[in-house]
Amino acid sequence: MIAKLKGLVDSVAEDHAVIDVGGVGYLVFCPARVLTRLPSPGQAVALVVETQVREDHISLFGFLETAERDWFRLLSTVQGVGSKVALSVLSVLSAGQISQAIAAGDKAALGRAPGVGPKLAARIASELKDKAVALGGMPAPPPRGAGTDAAGEGPPGGPTGDVLGDAVSALVNLGYGRSEAVGAASRAAGLGATTVQGVIGLALRDLGRGGA
């Protein structure tokens, strides 16, 4: 099984690249986000590779980051998601954005990928939610009032569910996607923000830098 290719970019097409490794050209299917980041032909490149062996052919799928390869594998485990759809998702969302979208249940973000309809987006979000959190996605904020004690106070040192929920709602109203709003608000809370204004302020700064 081929797990990595290190060589020279020979050519780049719409859905694949040919990598020259010691005079042998390997055709590697890649997400569009990867293809646009490859160096010019003749330049060195290293790709993390997933090898799929079928009865009549062997296919190589290449990625610049291990996290991209890991998400390709996970997406491919969902019924209705083949290699083509998995590449489609990774073409419109980075590995981090996929984690955030699934952890937040943001089916609209997943549905931006060609071939992913509402039902398939819901299935992906449902089946991979736990894995998304494990891979760095931030879970959606708890429902309003959740996680508070009898006095209505949140856990020491952190914002209440009401605060996170209100901050996320405000960010969404400003035009940000729910998944990126959840991620930015959660990171703001991790930096010590405990009020709606504090969370929004840090989150907007985070979003202005393009997120984590």
Swiss-Prot record:
It is found in: Cytoplasm. Residues 1-64 are annotated as: Domain I. Signal peptide: none annotated. Residues 136-161 are annotated as: Disordered. The keyword Transmembrane helix does not apply. GO terms for molecular function: ATP binding; four-way junction DNA binding; four-way junction helicase activity. Its main location: cytoplasm. GO terms for biological process: DNA recombination; DNA repair. SMART domains: HhH1. It comes from the Bacteria. GO terms for cellular component: cytoplasm; Holliday junction helicase complex; Holliday junction resolvase complex. Residues 65-143 are annotated as: Domain II. Residues 144-158 are annotated as: Flexible linker. Belongs to the RuvA family. The RuvA-RuvB-RuvC complex processes Holliday junction (HJ) DNA during genetic recombination and DNA repair, while the RuvA-RuvB complex plays an important role in the rescue of blocked DNA replication forks via replication fork reversal (RFR). RuvA specifically binds to HJ cruciform DNA, conferring on it an open structure. The RuvB hexamer acts as an ATP-dependent pump, pulling dsDNA into and through the RuvAB complex. HJ branch migration allows RuvC to scan DNA until it finds its consensus sequence, where it cleaves and resolves the cruciform DNA. Homotetramer. Forms an RuvA(8)-RuvB(12)-Holliday junction (HJ) complex. HJ DNA is sandwiched between 2 RuvA tetramers; dsDNA enters through RuvA and exits via RuvB. An RuvB hexamer assembles on each DNA strand where it exits the tetramer. Each RuvB hexamer is contacted by two RuvA subunits (via domain III) on 2 adjacent RuvB subunits; this complex drives branch migration. In the full resolvosome a probable DNA-RuvA(4)-RuvB(12)-RuvC(2) complex forms which resolves the HJ. Has three domains with a flexible linker between the domains II and III and assumes an 'L' shape. Domain III is highly mobile and contacts RuvB. This is Holliday junction branch migration complex subunit RuvA. It comes from Rhodospirillum rubrum (strain ATCC 11170 / ATH 1.1.1 / DSM 467 / LMG 4362 / NCIMB 8255 / S1). The lineage of its organism: Bacteria, Pseudomonadati, Pseudomonadota, Alphaproteobacteria, Rhodospirillales.
